[in-house]
Amino acid sequence: MAKGAREKIKLESTAGTGHFYTTSKNKRTTPNKLEFNKYDPVVRKHVLYKEIKLK
């Protein structure tokens, strides 16, 4: 059976709060790292979230 193209990733807050979101991405179509402005409930603001590999 073939291996799937989607990889699970973790989007971690750059505010240093330790908050993160998990999602998946297609590693063939988006080989670069993702960055999103998302809501961090710890600091109650929108901050930059960067992709790190999910262990």
Swiss-Prot record:
Source organism superkingdom: Bacteria
GO terms (BP aspect): translation
GO cellular component, one term: cytosolic large ribosomal subunit
SUPFAM superfamilies reported in the protein's UniProt record: Zn-binding ribosomal proteins
InterPro entries on file: Ribosomal_bL33 (IPR001705), Ribosomal_bL33_CS (IPR018264), Ribosomal_bL33_sf (IPR038584), Ribosomal_zn-bd (IPR011332)
The keyword Acyltransferase belongs to this UniProt entry's keyword annotation: no
GO MF annotation list: structural constituent of ribosome
Pfam families: Ribosomal_L33
Keyword Lyase: no
Keyword list, A-Z: Ribonucleoprotein, Ribosomal protein
Family recorded in the similarity comment: Belongs to the bacterial ribosomal protein bL33 family.
Protein's recorded name: Large ribosomal subunit protein bL33
Gene it is expressed from: rpmG
